[in-house]
Amino acid sequence: MGLSDGEWQLVLNVWGKVEADLAGHGQDILIRLFKGHPETLEKFDKFKHLKTEADMKASEDLKKHGNTVLTALGAILKKKGHHEAELKPLAQSHATKHKIPIKYLEFISEAIIHVLHSRHPAEFGADAQGAMNKALELFRKDIAAKYKELGFHG
C-alpha cells in the first residue's frame, strides 16, 4: 500500500500547484463533494443553507473551510506516509465531534482527484492520479484505524 519515492514526488509536485491557491482548490473540491454527494452537506451546519453552486461559489466561509481542509491534507501528504502526529487530532475531531464516516472521505478523495485533474491536466496525468489515489487510500486506511481505536465505526 505504501508509495514509492517516485510516486510521492508526483503527489508533491501537483500539491505545489494546489498550494498556490489552497482556498480556491478547496472551495472547488467542497463544491464538487456537495454537488456529487448532497448528503455530505448535512454534516456542515454552517453550509446547509447553500443550495446552489452559485451560493457555494459566493460563500467566503466555504472558501475558508476549503483552505483549512487542504492545509491539513497538505501537512499529511508532505509526511509521505509518516503522518501519525498529524492524523491523530484529525481522526479525533472527525470521529468524535463531526462524526464523518469513512465513506465521506472516499467521496472527498474522488472530488480531489477530479478537481486536480480538471485544474492541472498537464501535471496530473494518469501516473500522478494513480499516485494521489494511493496516497489518499493510505490516509483513509490510517484514519479508519484511528476511528476504530476511538470506537467510531463510521
Curated annotation (Swiss-Prot):
Q: What is this protein called?
A: Myoglobin
Per its UniProt record, what Gene3D superfamilies does this chain match?
6.10.140.2100, 6.10.140.2110
* Disulfide bridge positions per record: none
**Where does this protein hold O2?**
H65
> Family per UniProt?
Belongs to the globin family.
Q: Which Gene Ontology cellular component annotation is one that this UniProt entry carries?
A: sarcoplasm
Q: Which positions bind heme b?
A: H94
